[in-house]
């Protein structure tokens, strides 16, 4: 049977088990435990221990929700990917459009699909932060400011996907040099690193 720190399987596919990976526990992509090496730790001679930046969760196990809710959350993720791609290309106007689409999609997520108070509370706390960061991106006039807010959006969407799951494979990626060398995470549909925090300057960092 599955333990809390093991992989999460949903309808034959798995969601990224970010908490397990980043805390060095066993996961689908890290069967034996221990820190997951992202390939960026020694980039440009810099050594950055991913354990210095952790994503905290109230629970390490995923909360069971309906497939309908997961599908609605997936539309938010898809809008996020378009926003991420716009940031990679440093297209400020497209970033604004994508952030507005993300806000539209998240407003359509039906909270009535969450059956108990704990699940509802978890979602409400995350959606508040997601909306706050995304709204800030939609109002930002330059790419640097957009990327700053994207960091917070990413952290909270990672948490949401970890807790509730979506029926697709998702990768959590990390750049140790972003956020003034404090590092920053983002989500991707592919394992290949394409950096939204630096664009052409360090595209594969």
Residue ranges and their predicted role:
Residues 1-205:
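Intrinsically disordered, low-complexity terminal tails/loops enriched in metal-binding residues
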């Amino acid at each position: 049977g599955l333990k809390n720190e093991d992989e999460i399987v949903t309808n034959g596919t798995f969601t990224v088990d970010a908490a397990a990976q980043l805390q060095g526990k066993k996961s689908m992509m890290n069967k034996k435990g221990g820190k997951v090496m992202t390939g960026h730790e020694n980039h440009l001679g810099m050594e950055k221990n991913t354990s210095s930046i952790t994503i905290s969760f109230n629970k390490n196990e995923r909360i069971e929700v309906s497939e309908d809710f997961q599908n609605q959350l997936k539309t938010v993720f898809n809008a996020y990917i378009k926003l991420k791609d716009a940031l990679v290309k440093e297209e400020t106007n497209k970033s604004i459009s994508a952030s507005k689409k993300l806000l539209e999609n998240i407003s359509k997520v039906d909270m009535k699909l969450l059956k108990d108070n704990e699940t509802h509370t978890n979602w409400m706390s995350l959606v508040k932060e997601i909306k706050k960061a995304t709204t800030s991106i939609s109002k930002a006039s330059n790419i640097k400011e957009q990327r700053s807010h994207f960091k917070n959006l990413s952290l909270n969407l990672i948490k949401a996907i970890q807790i509730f799951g979506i029926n697709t494979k998702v990768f959590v990626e990390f750049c140790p040099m972003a956020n003034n060398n404090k590092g920053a995470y983002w989500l991707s549909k592919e394992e290949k690193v394409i950096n939204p925090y630096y664009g052409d300057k360090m595209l594969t960092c």
